């Protein structure tokens, strides 16, 4: 019998290839943390600007792309899945050139 997941976010697992060429699964949040650590390390003491927008767009664009594929372009279904109204979805699709 399959166990039910307690938190839907637990389903957001990223497969990562580690240094020994082994695939490991880790939560999306851990991948975001690691990406930010790498980003900060590359700043070399410089200040970051628009970090929130940078991270949001890196996650939002592929999420919208996959949801639109899953719903076969049905914006009403996609908006329901995402928990946003259809007008908001349309604005986001336009922002990323997906309309």
UniProtKB/Swiss-Prot annotation:
InterPro entries referenced in this protein's UniProt entry, alphabetically: Fis_DNA-bd, Homeodomain-like_sf, HTH_Fis, Trans_regulatory_Fis
Keyword list, A-Z: Activator, DNA-binding, Transcription, Transcription regulation
DNA-binding region: 75-94
One Pfam family matching this protein: HTH_8
GO molecular function: DNA-binding transcription factor activity; sequence-specific DNA binding
Residues making up the signal peptide according to the UniProt record: none
Known function: Activates ribosomal RNA transcription. Plays a direct role in upstream activation of rRNA promoters.
Similarity comment: family membership: Belongs to the transcriptional regulatory Fis family.
Quaternary organization: Homodimer.
Name used for this protein in its record: DNA-binding protein Fis
């Amino acid at each position: 019998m399959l166990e039910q997941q307690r938190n839907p976010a637990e389903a957001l697992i990223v497969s990562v290839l580690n240094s020994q060429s082994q695939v490991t699964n880790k939560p999306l949040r851990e991948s975001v943390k690691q990406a930010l650590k790498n980003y900060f390390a590359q700043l070399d003491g410089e200040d970051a600007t628009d970090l929130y927008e940078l991270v949001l767009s890196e996650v939002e664009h592929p999420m919208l792309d996959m949801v639109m594929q899953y719903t076969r372009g049905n914006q009403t279904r996609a908006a329901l899945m995402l928990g946003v109204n259809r007008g908001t979805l349309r604005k986001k699709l336009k922002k990323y050139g997906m309309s």
